[in-house]
Amino acid sequence: MAPQPLEQGGAVTSFIPTGQEMAQRQNLIPLGRLIDFIIQRTYHELTVLAELLPRKTDMDRKIEIYNFSASTRQLFIRLLALVKWANSASKVDKSAKIMGFLDKQSMLFIDTADMLSRVARETLVHARLPNFHIPAAVEILTTGSYSRLPSVIRDRIVPPDPITPAEKRQTLQRLNQVIQHRLVTGSLLPQLRKFRIENGRVTFKVDHEFEVSLTVMGDAPTVPWRLLDIDFLVEDKETGDGKALVHPLQVNYIHQLIQGRIVDCTDALAEVYTCLHYFCQSLQLEVLYTQTLRLIRDRLDDHIHVDEYVVGSRLTVSYWRELTNKDPKSELGYRLTIQTDPNDAAKQLAILHVPSIGNKEADIADRAVRSDLLSMERLLVHTVYVRSLARLNDVKTELQLFLKDVEYNIQGTPAMLTVPVLNPCLRAEHIYITVDTHTGMLRCHVPKHLDCPIMPEMQHALNNDWSKLQHLISELRYWITQRRCEKTLQHLPAATQDRLPLIYSHTHPIARMGPHKVFIQLYRHANVILIVELKEKKTCPNEMTYTFYLVLVKPSSVEEGQSPDVLSGQPPQPSAAGGPAPGSDSANAAMPKMYLRVLSMIEFDTFVATHGPGTYIDDPSPTSTSGTSVKRKVSPLDNALSAIGPPLKQQKTIYPAYFIPELAHVVAMCDEKLPFVTLAKEFSMRKIPHGGLQVEANATSLVLKLLTLPQPKPPQAPPTPQQQQQQQQQQQQPGTSDAKSSGAGASANEPKTVHVPPIDKQVWNALLKRLLSVSVRAQVNKSNQTRLWTMELVFYGSPLPSLHHKEQGMRRAVYLQYEMQPVESVSKVVDQLLSDWSKIVYLYTLVHEFREQYNNEKYNLPSMVAIKSYSYTNLLLAYGPNKDVSVNICWDTEAKEFRLVFTGGNSAINAHSMMRDQLQAHLNHNYSLAQVVHMLHETYQPLSSIAKLPIIPHLAILQSPKIPVLSFCIIPQSPTLLRISFQGVYCLEVRFRGGGLCTIRDGAYSRFDRSHVVEEFTPTQGLKGFLSKYVDETAVFRRRSQSEDDNPPSPVTLEDPSAGAGNNGGGGGGGGGAGGGANTFLSGGTGMRGPQSPRDPGLRFAAPLTPPTSSNPHTPASPHPIGGGGGAGGAGGQGGQGGQGGQQQSHMNNFNMTSPPASHMPHPSPGGGLMPSSPLNAQPSPMAAHSPGPSSLSYMQSHTDGSPFAALSPAASNWPGSPGMPRPSPRPGQSPEHKVQTSHHYTSRVLPARSWAGAIPTTLTYEALDTLCRATPHPQKEVPGPELSPLERFLGSVFMRRQLQRIIHQEESLMAITSNEPGVVVFKADCLQYQVFLNPNHMQSLHLKVDQLPMGPMMDGKPPYQWAAQDLQILEQFFDHRVAAPPYRPAVMTSFTRMLNLPAKVLKDFIQIMRLDLMPELVQGNKWNVQFVLRVPPSATPIVPVGTTTILSHRQKILFFIQITRVPYLPNMEWKDAVTMLLPMVYDMNMNHTTLAERREPMPPQLTSAVSAHLRRFSECSVLLPDECSLFPAVHDLLLTLTLPNEPPAPGQMQMQLGGVMQPGGGPGVPGGPGGPMGGQIGGPTPQVVPQVGSSPSPMMHSPMQQMGGGGPQPGAYGGMVGGPGGGPQSGGPVGGGPGGPN
């Protein structure tokens, strides 16, 4: 058997693909099919039973049912066994597949060996090959041929050998000679002269017709021509779509036809040409005809027409049919005919034109049909172009009759004739005349003005009546010139009008103007118009002349009455542009409601107006008819306009053709100079002398120079609404009213003069001497292109030496700018100018007086202040220790008073900004700059110290925790008096006395009655003792002795009449002689105190002109909101008509209407009781203000002896050369026995045994005040907390003590105990007695002392709980560090006191939690650190309001909050990566269970669930001792064993969400972390997500996790609130902490 491949089966018949070997060896069935079979069988048997059983007996039915159930059960048991076995069948199946594969391989090897053996033994023995023809095969394979092929086969199949190339060349060369001989000997047509002979054939070519090839078949002369090839050259490139015009069948037909005709023809070549030439001409005519039809159909419509078409003969087409219909001359029309030559058919197509055209143009037209591109469109275009040139030449000839010396141009395709109408003229302004190629009609337009209204009329004249062209071109010339005027003025503030409603007499020169004129309205000058009259030059019509007229008009209306011209019987001219005659209906209908009445007119000489600065204006007379000018009466405006002249002649500039330089120059000249004319007229009306309008040197600009400026007048206060109402009532009253009543009403309604600084004649003359020149110029603002008035005031030098580098020269220029208003608003510009001038004058009055004092060495002003800049409008003074802060002084023209603007240095703001209103009022009352400088110098240091107090608003201070309250609120009262409010509860009154001293008293007490307390504030208990710790007796007495040495007693007595003038005005704050403006520190008088200012003697600052923000008008301690005129020191000042203070008065007058006499109140008053307009107020005395008193700083000196009287000299210090030393002395009207206190009240450190001891001022040095206000660490180093000022710590401690007292009175379970020690709060709760007191050493912190009281047995018979000393010590320490600590929140104290009310066993567990909070290092192995939270933070679960107390007891259940923080447990793990949770805990005293307070949520947070589950598991599994509270064991177990579900996390990347809120938080001791300054904000590069089990914004603020080398912060002191201070560097933490949490 032949061998077969294995793929075909072969001997191995059982071969199957891999993986299917088991299918033949075993009967396999899918398990699903098997289950189907079993179910079907069971269903079938069940169906049979259902059908058969009803027929059987009961026993048989039972037997059948049993058999069915048994068999079915056995079947399904087997199926179940099979299914269970199928779980392991895969291993057996794999083994079976391997065995099958190995069997198949073995079988293949055996079969292969058998097959090879059979082939070798049987098949190959008998194998043989046939005899092949080896030689023939070799020959064919090697040579490619077979030489032994029989001849019979070779002759029939193999072709003969071709001739050789040499024989071919010889034959063709011989044939060429034969053809050439025939052509030479025969006759040849001229059209066939173009031929070529090559390759045994001759090819004739007739251009644009055909190309034919012929040859001969022998060299005999009788052998006919043989036609080889025909190629037609006629093409239709426009409509042929690239296809051949002659079909190949047609070419074959023509080929056969010509071949048949030339066989027997004697002149065969002529016959060939004739046939082909006729056919090509017919084809060309057909192509042209087809193109013409397509043109008519697609584009030209009826503009062309095929008049005649004879196939193969002619084609006639007519064009310009519209012109043919309108032009009577063209009777035959415009036609062209394409035809063959009837005489000589051999010629090409000819074109005939009707009418005829020149030979040259005709030859060009013939090219359209004798070129490669056969096109009827080209023929028509060229013909129309030739016709258009002819028509345009005719028009040109007509125009040359009246437009000579004009350059005409005919150019372009289609041809255009350009005609310039002006000289110079833009190409776009030429008249373009062309011929419509479709109709032959003439068209014209001006490219630049396509909307020209003259063009339709001119086009009609070109096609019909050429006689109108001259007039129309002239009108076009004027029209284009008007458009040029518009183009020229497009960037100038003017607009052109063709018509304006002008009213003038018929004899007015405007009526004699020509019809062509342009009206120009100036935008900025509504009362002036410019008329430009246009005329053509007679010698050269293309050039225009311009005449300018300036017309002054007045807007009027028809209702105003008839004009004087009408009244005189002369009808007015209604329109200057030429309208209908007046009186006609159409004229009345077209008459505008508003018109312009012509007042005067001035004609400009164009040459003079455009050359030179001294322009002469030619003014023609109205009655003059000639061109000469005669004089007439000139109006004031004409006189002003006669001064108008442009700058000097500029270099000639080449302008574009559309630009009219004369017009632009005149318009710009008018626009530039008319404002100056109007301004000069306004100056003249106000009697301000000026030098008229001038041109500056080198023609740079125009300038209006003022000779001088007037002295400012005191401004008038606007009338009040009541006065305006009275005026209206008086106007409505009849004229018969009583004259007296009307006079009284008029005097009452007169405007009152505003109080301004008096301008002394000497000061005014000094200012005018320095004023060198005043110039007014016009400028353009480059930013918004608006015009401005620039006023330049040049002064000589400066009265004050300035440090500014630009103010060193002797020429000082001041520039003031104003917006250029319209003509009707020019008075506003002058008002602004005079207002700014008053700004300079009033400031100079201050500077002039200040200059004398500044240069006086005795006043030592240069050491106090440096003049940074004085620009005559602003004065900038630098002061301070390093001269780094400044004050800017200027006059406010709107408010009519001086303004002060304080600016700080590079490091801080200016502390005087808070006193700006008071200092500003003092300056505007006294007008003494030196006083203000002294005040700034003396009060800079204390104000800078006070400015260090924090003014941050805090929440949870009031009962409503959401209302913010300022920590410190500074309320200025006068330049030397201010109040400081702490959290809206306490108030301190600080008075600056000069000489480095100040006084502080309790501002809660009234100045008039120590037993009376201001309603808004609460007395500060212990203030006197606290301040006495900072009193420096040596510094106080040293300053006092220096003052006595520098200021000896004055020999002048108080009875001296000259002393009385120095004591008028409101007394300063406590000692103020400076309050009234005359009693200045330079007046020589030390000043007299008011009756209510017995304490502060020498400080004579201004009266407090601004009431406190929280003043009560019904309280004597606060000034009335409208009665600040009396000053802080006295009720109405000192002086006046029989009032308090002036000369010696009786003691009966020394009282206020709202307060008892001052001798009974040795404490200062904040404000006076008199109104500003009270007659008891003394007026300033210029004599006293400028008196040469020598005392420089005496008003800042003060004494400290505690006397209620001012430290006055025995006599007033008006004696020349007397320094006027202030010392204790009884004032007039009071005897020395009225002294209430002595100096020991100031110097003693013993706390006075009076409740109003704080009302007595305490004298401190500025250094002590700075110590009070500067933030410093706590005096006790072991007490943690942020850096606060001692004053804030003291007030905060007093505030917390007051809150404790309030809570004790409110809580029934707390019993207050009376204490003999002042300032100590003693109370008891349960069996413990608590004592809260201020630290006696520094009085900056509260401390708690707890003692156990001896108690009898309880009500239930049990002995009282005995507290361990260590537990009580923990409670005291917790109070010191967590409760009475910043930020001093009442809720913290409330939480602590509620904790004290709890049962002893609960309180004991709370103390254990406090122990872990304060000392977490005591317990080792805790996973969490705990912190007791006493105030609800914003991040807590919304169970109780934010900021309120955290300990609540209700129905034997106690709610409290703790915060736990995970101790770092991974390497390199930091505190900022730790998890912090705020847990609201609930302790049930009945059940003794401690659980987590959870909100009822469908999906509680994961961490909440973990903590809650942990506490439930503890309550279920823990075993407590009898009577043991589960509170602390539950918390301790939580700290020891709580493990979160997702521990351990990656360091720094744990993100968790608890309660649906994710909050970032930092670690302890870092900014933003626990103890950081942000307390719960992002701290560090990795934000921490804090869970919301009520999570805190700053975890474990007080947890000492860094103590003992562990890196936890020291216990914080931020009121027990989460977010307190972090650990300091001494506790091992990385950084110190700051306040945190929601303050």
UniProtKB/Swiss-Prot annotation:
UniProt cross-references to InterPro entries, sorted A to Z: Med14_C, Med14_N, Med14_RM2, Med14_RM6, Med14_RM8, Mediator_Med14, RM3_Med14, RM5_Med14
Entry's Gene Ontology BP terms: regulation of transcription by RNA polymerase II
Segments of skewed composition (Gly residues): 1062-1088, 1122-1142, 1558-1579, 1604-1639
Motif LXXLL motif 1 per UniProt: ranges: 49-53
A GO cellular component entry from the record: mediator complex
Ranges annotated as biased composition (Polar residues): 1189-1201
Positions with biased composition (Low complexity): 575-586, 722-748, 1589-1603
Protein origin, superkingdom: Eukaryota
UniProt KW keywords: Activator, Nucleus, Repeat, Transcription, Transcription regulation
Pro residues: bias regions: 711-721, 1219-1229
Pfam families the UniProt entry points to: Med14, Med14_C, RM2_Med14, RM3_Med14, RM5_Med14, RM6_Med14, RM8_Med14
Cellular compartment(s): Nucleus
GO MF terms, alphabetically ordered: transcription coregulator activity
Span(s) of short sequence motif LXXLL motif 2: 768-772
Quaternary structure (record): Component of the Mediator complex.
Protein family membership: Belongs to the Mediator complex subunit 14 family.
Name of the protein this chain belongs to: Mediator of RNA polymerase II transcription subunit 14
Organism: Anopheles gambiae (African malaria mosquito)
